Every structure is written in structure tokens, then in C-alpha cells.
């Protein structure tokens, strides 16, 4: 077999599809391997200088770090940039071939491999975001339920927190004993979510104090621990961008263009 020049890998939960080409762009290697075997088979097959491409999906940054530690160049591609290179029906084999093709394009944009520290910070933010959604849902559930008993719940979360204890203590507001117990349980749930969010806010503040890049970002007007640490997790090394607009586009801060005709 000729020497592999590029290998595209379609990642999945349990089965990974690999597609390799040589320097003349001829397909010379296709393998479908389980999660426990694919890395060993790949490392036994490829030689130094072979480039490896993957979609920037779940698990991609972990495997990219593993391969980089072995001295290989890994290129992560956003899924929307791989899709145009799928030649026929979507399946694992065609996806791996499309990844292998996309990574060879001279103007392709790649995703920087995140460090473990970046992913730790990202995990904190995602968990916090999920808890905020849960808290909003819990507050809305309380508002909807008490409305059935003739109570008007305030829209502000702080006002709702103040109203719930007064509802529980007011014996003349028409709430049944069973619903008072249920409302008390919901109140406990809401307080627990508040505690979790507060703990994560404190952790984010600590991370922002410890990270030198986050410290520099906080010197900008309007940038606090939340934004600073979120940028560190999302961007990492800003030198990958040639200008600020490129970084803004990668974060989704620039408007998408849907016009035609160069207008």
C-alpha cells in the first residue's frame, strides 16, 4: 500500500469510519472500526507527515489531543463546511470521504483544538446555562400553578422569591393543604437551583482571576468574569484569526448574509 497522505475520520458513539488517500489523491484505505480499536489501528497504519481530519463534533477535541500528542497534524472542520463535499447519500463511509476531501481545500477554515482547560471552562458555562433554563422553567411552572388558585405571580424572579413564602404562610388565600405542600417542594427546588447557579458563578469568578488571558480581557469596558472566561473557552489562541471580524464571525456575532448579486 502506498503511503497515506490524509485520513478523514467520521466519529460516532461506537463505530468509526476511516478514509485515507495517498499523495496522488487516490483512495487506498477504508476501514470501519470499533471505538476500542480504531486509534491503535490508525497509529499502526499511518506514518509521520500524514494529516488527519475530523468534524468538530462531540469527542473530536479529545481524539485530536490524543493524536497531536503522538506528533500528528489534526484538522477539525465545522460540519457545515463538510456537507458540500458529500457526494451521494449520507452515511459513515461517505462522510469520512467528504471530511478527507474537505480538509484538502486550500481555503478551508478549521477549528482550533481545545485544551483540557478550555473544555473545563466550557463545561462550567454549559452546566450554568442549563441550570438557568431549569430555573426559568421552574419559576414559570410556579406562576402557572398558583394562577389556578387565583394568585397573581410577579414576573421578576426576585419578586417571585419574596412572594412564595408569603403565600405559604397566608392561611386565607385559598390554597389547599396538599397544594401548599407541593408549592413548598417547588420552592425548595427553586432555592436549590439558585444555590447551584451561585456556586458556579463563584467558580467562574475564580477561573477569571486565575487565567491571565481572562484577566486581560476584563480590562476592557463591559467585560466581566462571565464574558472573559466564555471567550477563553470558545477562542483560546486568538492568533488563529487574521482580524477581529473573523473572530466575531466564528462566535456568531456578525449577521449572516442571505443576499445575492453582490449587493
PLM feature segments, named:
Residues 126-216:
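Glycine-rich, often acidic, oxyanion-interacting loops/wings at catalytic, nucleic-acid
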